[in-house]
Amino acid sequence: MAEATDVVLVGGGIMSATLGVLLKELEPSWEITLIERLEDVALESSNAWNNAGTGHSALCELNYAPLGANGIIDPARALNIAEQFHVSRQFWATLVAEGKLEDNSFINAVPHMSLVMNEDHCSYLQKRYDAFKTQKLFENMEFSTDRNKISDWAPLMMRGRDENQPVAANYSAEGTDVDFGRLTRQMVKYLQGKGVKTEFNRHVEDIKRESDGAWVLKTADTRNPDGQLTLRTRFLFLGAGGGALTLLQKSGIPEGKGYGGFPVSGLFFRNSNPETAEQHNAKVYGQASVGAPPMSVPHLDTRNVDGKRHLMFGPYAGFRSNFLKQGSLMDLPLSIHMDNLYPMLRAGWANMPLTKYLLGELRKTKEERFASLLEYYPEANPDDWELITAGQRVQIIKKDSEKGGVLQFGTEIVAHADGSLAALLGASPGASTAVPLMIRLMHQCFPERTPSWEGRLKELVPGYGIKLNENPERADEIIAYTAKVLDI
């Protein structure tokens, strides 16, 4: 007998948690069930050690504003990401202010920087600064080529550096470090207190649609072969990170045809020596190597995890065919069907430089990887650093009318035409834009309810519907308010 519920959220990460809280705030009477394959929430990509936790707001990530062919830098994409992050930040602040999250310990003030180290990159960074400084959301950004000034911002990165090496840096004091694992756990704890059912160690075996439009999920208990649970729901969200593609394919919706995925794993060096970690307080992004994918931009980060400061450097790209860190090596081969084979082959052919880059990364020794860290931290001691494996990122491959298939960096909502099912595919910027992504998903799936939700949404997100960059006075008010509530 199927257990009926209004909403099923598959995946115990930041996306499901965010959508769950939004729906519970907007429709308190709806019954919600969250399913997670592992024994707790936030153990895959939302875990603090499986993501960069940058609080992506485009302050330091250079790949969001590349140099155009005309020599001009367009800040539009960076502004869009910054606007999205501020929507998330407002939502989190409201939940803290209303006592719905335990505290604000999931977010910390950590300056964001960009650091580049050759003449061409220094010239680019100057142009980027010139393009950004006139924008409200980037007005406090600083730029310098003065080595002493840069040393004040990031002393470890300048100590021992060649005096003749050109360097330039951007610095934004308003950057943050977000522990998405802690945030997810706080959100789910709130949901549990509101009656949301959480089913752990549950693997989704099958997804079928009934004649009345309801979705039926058959799940198995990963610890007990006899522990079957069947759920029946009128709205299904597939927010299982890299595992969402497999679930989307199981659903059989026509909108999911032609989608494939390319998994990329990430390695980081982690330093937990408090003496070293206390000397660096910034997230510092560099410039990606030629042919490197966007998620491989090198960065040296201050990370605050469970109240302790660490340093992380990476990522180093790797390849494993599983879609989740704790997934199966058969995930990729089993995801290849007749409808996505051609797009995947075409995308693979068009991205040979990426393939060559990944092969080169895979061949690197630990010493070769450490040499990259020394470019950013010249006096780094190998004994202080351990190499860790972060989460899997599954990049989207989709049909393209002109190219046959394209590899897409970013996130994408794939929803049934009637709004009864939605899946979130892709990766970066990911968690930092969870709130606007889930609001957009709700608008797409529940268009008839959107008008009645507007009032509460404006309470949850005070700047809802407003572009902060275009409303300076309102931006000042909202940014000051969220900074105060979140203690950043």
Swiss-Prot record:
Keyword Nuclease: no
UniProt record similarity statement: Belongs to the MQO family.
Pathway: Carbohydrate metabolism; tricarboxylic acid cycle; oxaloacetate from (S)-malate (quinone route): step 1/1
Pfam families: Mqo
Lineage: Bacteria, Pseudomonadati, Pseudomonadota, Betaproteobacteria, Neisseriales
Keyword RNA-binding included in the entry's annotation: no
Catalysed conversion reaction: (S)-malate + a quinone = a quinol + oxaloacetate
Any one Gene Ontology molecular-function term assigned to this protein's record: L-malate dehydrogenase (quinone) activity
Protein name, UniProt field: Probable malate:quinone oxidoreductase
